[in-house]
C-alpha cells in the first residue's frame, strides 16, 4: 500500500509506492518495504538537524524550508520563490530581487544600508 505524504497544510506532496523512494524534495521519502531504508531515514534526520548546512542552497526546496548558508553564516528560508535571510539585511553588491516592505539591503560595494517600503529604496542617511 502506497504512502501519501502530506504537507502541514494537508495538501498532498507525493505518493510513494511500495519498495521505492521519492526524491521530489531535498529529503528522500521511503516506500513500504524498501530495503536499506535505515541509512536514508537517518540521513534525513541529520539534514533536518543541521538545517541543510552548506555552501550552496538545497536544489529542490519547498516553501518554508530552512537552510544554513555556511558561507555567510546566515539562516535563510525559502519563500516559494527564493531563499531569504531570516533577519538582518540582504547583503550583496546589486539590489536583491523580491524585496518586500520592511526589508533591508546592505550594498556591500558602496557600504550603504537601504530600506524598502514596498515601492522605493531609501538610504539610511535620508
What spans do the regions from the language model cover?
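Extracellular "spike/adhesin" assembly and maturation modules
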Residues: 1-119
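Conserved small/polar residues in nucleotide/adenosyl-binding loops
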Residues: 122-126
Amino acid at each position: 500500500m502506497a504512502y501519501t505524504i502530506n504537507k502541514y497544510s494537508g495538501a498532498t506532496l507525493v505518493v510513494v509506492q511500495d519498495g521505492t523512494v521519492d526524491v521530489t524534495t531535498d529529503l528522500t521519502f521511503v516506500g513500504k518495504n524498501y530495503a536499506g531504508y535505515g541509512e536514508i531515514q537517518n540521513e534525513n534526520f541529520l539534514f533536518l538537524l543541521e538545517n541543510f548546512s552548506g555552501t550552496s542552497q538545497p536544489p529542490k526546496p519547498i516553501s518554508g524550508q530552512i537552510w544554513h548558508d555556511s558561507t555567510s553564516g546566515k539562516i535563510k528560508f525559502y519563500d516559494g520563490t527564493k531563499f531569504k535571510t531570516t533577519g538582518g539585511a540582504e547583503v550583496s553588491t546589486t539590489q536583491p530581487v523580491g524585496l518586500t516592505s520592511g526589508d533591508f539591503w546592505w550594498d556591500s560595494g558602496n557600504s550603504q544600508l537601504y530600506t524598502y517600503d514596498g515601492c522605493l529604496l531609501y538610504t539610511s542617511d535620508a
